[in-house]
Amino acid sequence: MPTISQLIRKRRVDKIVKTKAPALSYGFNNLKNKVQKYKSPQKSGVCIRVTTMTPKKPNSALRKYARVRLSNGTEVNAYIPGIGHTLQEHSVVLIRGGRVKDLPGVRYHIIRGILDAKGVINRKQSRSKYGSKKNKN
């Protein structure tokens, strides 16, 4: 426990909080031709490569992901959730933050049901997360 005179000489240092989705925390201003810091909940981008990746040790699968060039110029890896997708190169997608625990380097999710990422068909539960419409029965 420091004394008051010690705190006057050297104040307490705040902890530096590192962002978990850094590509969403800035954008590129084309008018001023420079990067500006502001936080966004989502960003749009264009798929450069759509491929699969194997997860870390105890799990085994082929997880689908896309390399996306965002509107601020950065390239990120984004996970494609749900069963089946129609994404290919040059597809325009919207991404959100949120990592995939067993895929190293994947810190973002593609939002299904918006732009070129179609919703999951025949999905009954958690439809809003996968952009699926309600079945007409």
Curated annotation (Swiss-Prot):
GO terms for biological process: translation. SUPFAM superfamilies: Nucleic acid-binding proteins. Disulfide bonds: none annotated. CDD domains: Ribosomal_S12 (cd03368). The modification 3-methylthioaspartic acid is found at residue 102. GO terms for molecular function: rRNA binding; structural constituent of ribosome; tRNA binding. Pfam families: Ribosom_S12_S23. Keywords: Methylation, Ribonucleoprotein, Ribosomal protein, RNA-binding, rRNA-binding, tRNA-binding. Part of the 30S ribosomal subunit. Contacts proteins S8 and S17. May interact with IF1 in the 30S initiation complex. Belongs to the universal ribosomal protein uS12 family. With S4 and S5 plays an important role in translational accuracy. HAMAP family: Ribosomal_uS12_B. This is Small ribosomal subunit protein uS12. It comes from Phytoplasma mali (strain AT). The gene is rpsL.
